[in-house]
UniProtKB/Swiss-Prot annotation:
Gene: nqrE
A GO molecular-function annotation: oxidoreductase activity, acting on NAD(P)H, quinone or similar compound as acceptor
Protein known as: Na(+)-translocating NADH-quinone reductase subunit E
Stored InterPro entries: NqrDE/RnfAE, NqrDE/RnfAE_oxidrdctase, NqrE
Membrane topology: Multi-pass membrane protein
Organism: Chlamydia pneumoniae
Amino acid sequence: MWLGAYTWLNVFGILLQAAFIQNILLANFLGMCSYLACSTRVSTANGLGMSVALVLTVTGSINWFVHAFITGPKALTWISPSLASVNLGFLELIIFIVVIAAFTQILELLLEKVSRNLYLSLGIFLPLIAVNCAILGGVLFGITRSYPFIPMMIFSLGAGCGWWLAIVILATIKEKLAYSDIPKNLQGMGISFITTGLIAMAFMSLTGIDISKPSAKIQRAPLETEVVENTTNPLKESSSKHQPSISKARTQRRSL
């Protein structure tokens, strides 16, 4: 339930994969609107990225329990075995969005009290975290992959940190581009998309690293075992055929 067939090395692989290899923004293009709009300054991008990472991590963990004990197949058997046939999967998206919206509202109230400047700089994009497709997409990705709780929490953390890292990198580059001589036709969205593509290509350099699969499920393929058996059986048969002739030759040598 908590870790399943995953080892801690696999959990680290899930974190690495969610943050870099399958970045929720650069590989899946989720959350692009706030990514492009709030990346003009590093301070604003850092605050929004931190908020998205926090919301995605917490809501991903909460929604895992929702799926496991309320909306998933046979999820209500913990109440009574007779409820095994009841399936509340049609309510899953609604409950997920309600959980995300509720936690976003709590985060908005906390930021208004703790950091008024960050609250004002984020503006309308802070309450829009509730409908940010990166949040709901990250939760659904983890649920459809049937992660246990700890891998699900780490996946949500990695996806949120990957989005945070991407927007901070773009904001840093944009601050440098403000003092550069950019061609007129590429100013604004044009140079932002080009920069985003280059960042995505840099993240793709880690594609070959794949340690996120559960180690306990790694077994030899059936086809491979059949090939090995077929190649070893003729050797056994040939050795058994030649065994009588070899023993006969040995007895003749001894008699001589």
